[in-house]
Structure formats: structure tokens, C-alpha cells
């Protein structure tokens, strides 16, 4: 347990300013996520260093396709979430409140493990990492000192204050999950404002953080042409045509029983992304598909071929297409 970094005292109550819910907690009360509590007028986090999952993952699994491809990130997750999505693929930890006594991992021990496992960076993921803000900040500072990169895989519903803390501490890349348009997000994810997610992505990008966007394409939720066009056009218009968009396949999980995303729907999402002017659109959870690869937007040359989460061909020289010399946006090279 640690005192939270972003809080506002309110005559015995306390407001949490980590995520955009900005919960106001009465004495003894918990926030929506159940990971923060008002104890004696002070906001405390109940999951500092409480690790539910730990794995050395290919960076492609996040997914990041334009950020140190072929490297590995030691990935840690904790408990709970600030969204209520009924299809959550990691529901076993995101829908669980923090245990009274969990496995504690200090930031320094985590960084020691990064080196021991041969990873080149860190990733806070699996559940919503914003809930682990205090731990993330310490991890990022130590990682930066040791020459490791730092990444977040997030639903993006973080406050500008939280974003700034993370960036100032060493956050280098963020994959933001855009779940749909405003009506679908409010209906399925428990009254959240999707514009705040876009704002977080724009803020991070303006501060030099590498951004990639992921959309889990779910039948009858966000798979209409209207919704997909809206997402693709906002990426192009608000973040930039060069920002990668991953349209990934959904599989039934937790309380959602809709059938898996048809390949035809995913390929339509790819086409919609290209029609919106996006230079890099990828299909996820479909290993071996040609749209899982990176192509030069100028000459069409295959630049990076992937099989699952493995890079099997790499044809970039100093971040440029070997065929035509076109500079490919991203963070390249080996760590």
C-alpha cells in the first residue's frame, strides 16, 4: 500500500485524479476500480507492486510494430480495471479486485528481472496500467537509468496529470485501445467518454511518445462501416496518417458470446483504414495474414514480414525502405 500520487483533498473526502473517472471517495470508500481507497482523508493505492502476471513478451505482442521490432519487453500486470467491457480478453485479472495480500514485486527487482531475462524494455499491460501509476513511475525512472525502453498498453482513460507523470518518468511508447464510437463505448464500457481517450493519445503524441492504436473488432458492437470509418478518420486527422492502426480479431470471452470476428470484417476494416489515408493498417490475431506485415507506403515493397509475434524478414536500413529510400515512421534499430 502506498499513498497515491494524484489526489485532491475535499473535507474528509478525496478525489482521485489518476483516471478520467475522477472518483470522489468518502472516508473508507473505494474508487470505481476498487484499487484506491480513502484512508483517513488520504488516497492510497492498494496494488503498488502487486503483480498478477509477469512475462517476457515479444514487443509485437503488445502490439507494437513500429517500435524496436524483434525485441522483448518484460511485461507486468496487476488487478482490476476502470472500464467494464463485457468481452474482456483478460477478464480473470481485470475483473478481479486486488487480493488482500498479493505477490509484491519492487520496482528494482522488476528492473533486475528485465536484465536477467534478456529483455530490452518494460511494458505495463494485461490489466489497465493507469491503476498502477505509482509503481509505473518508479519502474520507468529506474528503467531509463538502466537503458531500457518503457511502454504502456492502455485503454487511454488517463488524466493529463497522469500522462505527464508517466512521460516525465520515461514513457516512450503507448498502444491505445480505441474501443469504438461514443455510443458503443458508453453502452458497453460503463459510461466513459471516448473523447478523453483520444485526448490522452494526442497529448502523448505531442510530447514525443510513439503511439499505435488498436481496435478489437467485435460483431454488432463496433464492426459497422460507420464506426470503423470514424475511428480511421480520427486517427488520420487527429494523430497522423503515419500512426499504425491494428484491427484485431475478437474471440468470445467473459460475458460476451458473439462469434469470432469474420475475416471478411477484418479485411473490410483494413480497406477502410486505407481509404481514410492511413499508411500502416494491420490485422491482428490472424497469424500469417499478409496484412500482418509492413509494406512501404511509397513503393509497396515488403519491409517487415511477421509470423505470429516473430519477425522473419526485416528490410529496413536506418529506418528507410531499401528499395526506394522512403523514411518509415517509427523507432527502429536493435537494443
Regions found by a protein language model. Give the residues of each.
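Short glycine-enriched, charge-decorated loop/helix-capping segments at active-site entrances
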Residues: 92-95, 99-100, 187-192
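Conserved AdoMet/S-adenosylmethionine-binding subsite of the radical SAM
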Residues: 107-265, 272
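Auxiliary Fe-S-binding modules of radical SAM enzymes
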Residues: 1-28, 221-335
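Glycine-centered loop/turn positions within well-structured domains
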Residues: 31, 83, 183
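Conserved, mostly hydrophobic/aromatic
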Residues: 85, 176, 281
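N-terminal [4Fe-4S]-dependent radical SAM core
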Residues: 1-78, 91-95, 292, 302-305
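Short cysteine/histidine-rich metal-coordination sites, predominantly Zn2+-binding motifs
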Residues: 32-42, 47-54, 98-110, 310-322, ...
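Long, charge-rich boundary regions
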Residues: 46-93, 115-118, 122, 126-129, ...
Amino acid at each position: 500500500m502506498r499513498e497515491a500520487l494524484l489526489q485532491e483533498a475535499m473535507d474528509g473526502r478525496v478525489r482521485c485524479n489518476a483516471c478520467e473517472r475522477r472518483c470522489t471517495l468518502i472516508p473508507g470508500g473505494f474508487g470505481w476500480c476498487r484499487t484506491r481507497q480513502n484512508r483517513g482523508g488520504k488516497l492510497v493505492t492498494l496494488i503498488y507492486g502487486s503483480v498478477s502476471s509477469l512475462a517476457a513478451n515479444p514487443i509485437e505482442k503488445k502490439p507494437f510494430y513500429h517500435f524496436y521490432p524483434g525485441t522483448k519487453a518484460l511485461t507486468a500486470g496487476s488487478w482490476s480495471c476502470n472500464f467494464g467491457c463485457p468481452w474482456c480478453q483478460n477478464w480473470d485479472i481485470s475483473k478481479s479486485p486486488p487480493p488482500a495480500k498479493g505477490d509484491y514485486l519492487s520496482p528494482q527487482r522488476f528492473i533486475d528481472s528485465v536484465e536477467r531475462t534478456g529483455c530490452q524494455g518494460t511494458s505495463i499491460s494485461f490489466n489497465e496500467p493507469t491503476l498502477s501509476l505509482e509503481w509505473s513511475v518508479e519502474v520507468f525512472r529506474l528503467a531509463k537509468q538502466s537503458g531500457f525502453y518503457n511502454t504502456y498498453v492502455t485503454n487511454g482513460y488517463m488524466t493529463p496529470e497522469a500522462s505527464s507523470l508517466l512521460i516525465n518518468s520515461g514513457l516512450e511508447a503507448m498502444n491505445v485501445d480505441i474501443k469504438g464510437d461514443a455510443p458503443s463505448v458508453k453502452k458497453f464500457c460503463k459510461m466513459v467518454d471516448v473523447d478523453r481517450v483520444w485526448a490522452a493519445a494526442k497529448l502523448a503524441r505531442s510530447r514525443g511518445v510513439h503511439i499505435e492504436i488498436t481496435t478489437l473488432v467485435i460483431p454488432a458492437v463496433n464492426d459497422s462501416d460507420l464506426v470503423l470509418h470514424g475511428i480511421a478518420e480520427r486517427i488520420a486527422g487527429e494523430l497522423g496518417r503515419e500512426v499504425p492502426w491494428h484491427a484485431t480479431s475478437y474471440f468470445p470471452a467473459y460475458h460476451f458470446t458473439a462469434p469470432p470476428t469474420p475475416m471478411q470484417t477484418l479485411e473490410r476494416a483494413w480497406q477502410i483504414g486505407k481509404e481514410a489515408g492511413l499508411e500502416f493498417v494491420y490485422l491482428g490475431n490472424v497469424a500469417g495474414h499478409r496484412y500482418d506485415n509492413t509494406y512501404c507506403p511509397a513503393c509497396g515493397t515488403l519491409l517487415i514480414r511477421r509470423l505470429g509475434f516473430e519477425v522473419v524478414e526485416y528490410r529496413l536500413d536506418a529506418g528507410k525502405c531499401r528499395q526506394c529510400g522512403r523514411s518509415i515512421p517509427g523507432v527502429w534499430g536493435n537494443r
